[in-house]
Amino acid sequence: MKIGIYPGSFDPVTLGHLDVIRRSAKIMDELVIGVLANSSKTPLFTVEERVKLLECVVKDIPNVKVVAFDGLTVDFAKKLGAKFLIRGLRAITDFEYELQIAQTNHKLDEEIDTVFFTTSVEYSYLSSSIVKEIASYGGDISKFVPNSIIQVIYDKYNGKRSE
């Protein structure tokens, strides 16, 4: 059975992430979206919120599940019996960084291989950081995130403003 892990912070999940999820789910028997709990970034959403948002947007993909984790991705993969790590590449700068990580992960566990997906052209510029920047000013994020989570993102910023 081919089990893949797509790790990330997904803060928030974007249409670019969803594109990689849908495409990678086609080549894996099971795809686990690993939501990083101890990211070095300060998240907008808690890990629990990010898991719920992802579950909402992938509910129509039967072989995908969402799990929070912390620690090394290779240890998480080993625990789940996964042999493949999924990564999306937007630009050559992504490739340089992701290649280093992929080679390091392979050194840590030689049974782990990284599968790279180049981002579809319409999402090649997109990042969660861009979405957060636009949303923080009340801009239109409907072209960047799944419709089902747009209001949740705006609500998060409205709540931050009223605190």
From Swiss-Prot:
The keyword Transferase applies. Its cofactor is Mg(2+). Pathway: Cofactor biosynthesis; coenzyme A biosynthesis; CoA from (R)-pantothenate: step 4/5. It is found in: Cytoplasm. One of its GO terms (cellular component) is cytoplasm. It comes from the Bacteria. It catalyses: (R)-4'-phosphopantetheine + ATP + H(+) = 3'-dephospho-CoA + diphosphate. ATP binds at residues 9-10, 17, 88-90, 98, 123-129. One of its GO terms (biological process) is coenzyme A biosynthetic process. Substrate binds at residues 9, 41, 73, 87. Its EC number is 2.7.7.3. InterPro entries: Cyt_trans-like (IPR004821), PPAT (IPR001980), Rossmann-like_a/b/a_fold (IPR014729). CDD domains: PPAT (cd02163). Homohexamer. PANTHER family: PHOSPHOPANTETHEINE ADENYLYLTRANSFERASE. Belongs to the bacterial CoaD family. This is Phosphopantetheine adenylyltransferase. It comes from Lachnoclostridium phytofermentans (strain ATCC 700394 / DSM 18823 / ISDg) (Clostridium phytofermentans).
